[in-house]
């Protein structure tokens, strides 16, 4: 069985063709281009298998760091063979917020400023889909992304974070809803992990 591939680096496939796909591969061969150029190691290769509108399999590999996250729907999520999450919120004295190193928006900053917590807030800036994976492994509590991303930027890590017991949700006007894939417009809406 072979499935079609939707990729940042591939040809543009019209929605009229894509809307009939039951399964497809969603691939970003280089997520975190700015981090790659900066040579800081915070870039990833993202591969997801999408069923209708939901990631059911995901692999996020950071080659410079030699770190691999993966998940399969119903079978948990892992980081280098260790089941996620590795830590729980109760094991920390701070509320860790992860944000983009290269793409912080005013809206994201306002969201972070409005977070109400009894713990001291700690901001972690990192590139690529590693932000989502930090929430999956329990190294961060929340990742708000109120700025532009594409479906291939999130699909693989979305599978990982979902199987870790957390979730990636669409965020609009203070309300959360399911984040879907293979939409007519491949630009993601704002989301919070």
Spans of features found by a protein language model:
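Conserved beta-strand segments of alpha/beta enzyme cores
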Residues: 4, 121-122, 167
